[in-house]
Amino acid sequence: MSIRPNNYCALLCRDPRRLRLINSHPIVVDLVRRCLEESGLKFEFYQNSNVTCAFKFSKHLFRRRGLTSEEDGIKIRNALANIVAEMSKINWEVDFSTDIGRHLTNSCIFFTQNLNPKEDASGNVFTFAPSGTSKALLINVPDGIENQIVDGIKKVIKISDPEKLDTKASRIEMSSFAWYSTGDSAISIR
């Protein structure tokens, strides 16, 4: 399949406070806006041209160690997961993504439209995300799957018991590990 302007779009985290939509199809703009509104995050929508628009947040959400609160981190991660799930329902699939939320890396989620869907997209999207130096957030993970993930991590490294947060999230803390660590053991943990 060749990529044409009418069957791709991208969400770009270019700025710590801005999510830009490239090749902004009206149905996709409405979907992204709805998912962000449902997240409870405050943002302004603006359109630069017929093919690009942006959502500017009131807080820095895409910067390492720049979140104003863990709750905001959960909200934006949950919103992005919902965007992926909702896009899938209208036959837009993640083609690839880069490291989301790293300061000044132009993180991106690139979507292509599946013009010949073979299966119905169904099910929820959940998130496993680094948080702080040595913590991880499990967002919207069904209990059975969360237990499997936690058990799998425990086989590799010592961790705290999952702490349930006010939202649909749990936090675990890893002992003697930092996300920025290098080397073979750090890679195996990731």
Regions found by a protein language model. Name each.
Residues 1-78, 96-190:
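Interaction-mediating elements
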Residues 90-96:
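Low-complexity, intrinsically disordered activation/interaction regions
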